[in-house]
Amino acid sequence: MESAMRAQAPPTSPGPAIDVRDLRMRYGTKDVLTGVSFAARRGEVLALLGPNGAGKTTTIEILEGFRMRSAGEVSVLGQDPARGDEAWRARLGVVLQSWRDHSRWRVRDLLGYLARFYAPYGTTDVPRPWDVDELIDVVGLTEHADLKVQKLSGGQRRRLDVAIGIVGRPELVFLDEPTAGFDPHARREFHDLVHRLADFENTTVLLTTHDLDEAEKLADRILVLDGGTIVADGTADQLARELTTQAEVRWTVGGRRHVHAVEDGDPTAFVRRLLANDPDVTELEVRRASLEDTYMTLVHRAETAGGRPSAGGEQTDRTEEVQA
């Protein structure tokens, strides 16, 4: 299946998939976004993190064209989302946290019904929609293609959500808490799917999640939104190196386990001394701060500097309904 995806991969388009400059949003007298700026290249996987009320949902809805902004410049796939037409929207995929649908739909029938919308917007470079049976195979639902939606398990149901979001072979996919309710096996398979979309289809992915381990595994870059602005932008390793000061060195000598905390964040000198002074060291490992540690440090710094909790007031109930 990966070879088929590679063969059909659309060519790289010029310019970033997302370009946001000084994005601002105000609800009444409350400023939710106070100057958000970032860009995403084609085929990049970004995770947008932040505490509840930080403005994540508002940001995503503006990028999707579902909410008007107060100020700032936004370009998504080369167009202003506020002026995006149906042809532009057909290039986007949205995987919501929940989807209300008619329980009598069968998997193949539902995807076939939705796929028809995208047919007029296919091009030579990007044929649309995705072949339904191929898509069902990609998301791991071949054995369940003729089942009614109500018969699917939670993990299978979430795979269908993903299939619904990408049936039009989008160039940009928005994922909202994509693996909520997944068991570990289903989560790993979903991660593989996201990587295949980015690597073989050159699909840009912007995901929001509260699962920091998932963000660390999936994202090429991590954005942290707090107080209405981006307070960090980089890989998990870059953020840990820049924002946390402690690393942990663990080793074994004579069957006894030892642990040492390095406060300056660079354990290289300590490890060299350790190995030079004791040749019997085994099971040596260095643990840097986790993304969770880094994230908590960032949020604490941002809220302390701002003198207030994260901006609130955004609406977060994002659902869609399909009628039979």
Regions found by a protein language model. Name each.
Residues 233-234:
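ABC ATPase "signature
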Residues 112, 116-119, 124-144:
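Conserved ABC ATPase "signature" region
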